[in-house]
């Protein structure tokens, strides 16, 4: 497995690779959201059923526009999400019909976050798009908190580890339904 900086890993992602990278609270697994084969590989590595869907993380809301159906949201709903970003808040928003079901699962919505973590932001900026994001762990197990554990648990399963530090969040992000305002998971 390659160990790279956030700026060096862009070609790996562009070629369909799956990476591990530090986020605000835990290590994440990620790939290109427009590459179904990469998403399938990520789901296989994590042993996660496609039906559950995945999160997109971005450096700006503009990067999420190809995926989110903003026409189904009010200005107040959008303003509320923007008031929490960048930061540890994930919003479940209506998804555009062309978005792969491998990414959105069985839902007519998709979970999205604009990250404040500098490495996540660098990754998304270098790709010029969001990154698929899910916690780096096998389904049902605790998330990975160290690069050493990534190297042990995922050595022959992923293509690269992005070097860097986790953020200061003790818990994963809060998840909010953008349409109803309902908190689906309390985070930090």
From Swiss-Prot:
GO CC annotations, alphabetized: cytoplasm
Keyword line: ATP-binding, Cytoplasm, Nucleotide-binding, Nucleotidyltransferase, Transferase, tRNA processing
Annotated protein name in UniProt: Threonylcarbamoyl-AMP synthase
MF (Gene Ontology): ATP binding; double-stranded RNA binding; L-threonylcarbamoyladenylate synthase; tRNA binding
Catalyzed chemical reaction(s): L-threonine + hydrogencarbonate + ATP = L-threonylcarbamoyladenylate + diphosphate + H2O
Enzyme Commission number(s): 2.7.7.87
Entry-linked PANTHER family: SUA5, THREONYLCARBAMOYL-AMP SYNTHASE
Entry superkingdom: Bacteria
Gene3D superfamilies in alphabetical order: DHBP synthase (3.90.870.10)
Organism the protein comes from: Shewanella denitrificans (strain OS217 / ATCC BAA-1090 / DSM 15013)
Reported function: Required for the formation of a threonylcarbamoyl group on adenosine at position 37 (t(6)A37) in tRNAs that read codons beginning with adenine. Catalyzes the conversion of L-threonine, HCO(3)(-)/CO(2) and ATP to give threonylcarbamoyl-AMP (TC-AMP) as the acyladenylate intermediate, with the release of diphosphate.
Pfam families on file: Sua5_yciO_yrdC
Protein family per UniProt: Belongs to the SUA5 family. TsaC subfamily.
Primary subcellular site in the record, as a coarse category: cytoplasm
């Amino acid at each position: 497995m390659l160990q790279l900086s956030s700026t060096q890993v862009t070609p790996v992602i562009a070629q369909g690779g799956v990476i591990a990278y530090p986020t605000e609270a835990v290590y994440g697994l990620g790939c290109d959201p427009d590459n179904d084969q990469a998403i399938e590989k990520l789901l296989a590595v994590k042993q996660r059923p496609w039906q559950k869907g995945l999160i997109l993380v971005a450096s700006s809301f503009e990067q999420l526009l190809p995926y989110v159906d903003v026409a189904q949201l009010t200005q107040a709903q959008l303003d509320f999400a923007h008031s929490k970003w960048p930061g540890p808040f994930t919003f479940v928003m209506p998804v555009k019909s062309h978005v792969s079901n491998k990414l959105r699962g069985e839902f007519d919505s998709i979970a999205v976050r604009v990250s404040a973590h500098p490495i996540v932001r660098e990754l998304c900026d270098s790709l010029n798009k969001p990154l698929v994001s899910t916690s780096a762990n096998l389904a049902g197990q605790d998330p990975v908190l160290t690069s050493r554990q990534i190297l042990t648990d995922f050595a022959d399963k992923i293509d690269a580890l992005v070097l860097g530090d986790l953020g200061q969040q003790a818990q994963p992000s809060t998840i909010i339904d953008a349409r109803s305002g309902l908190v689906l998971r309390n985070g930090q």
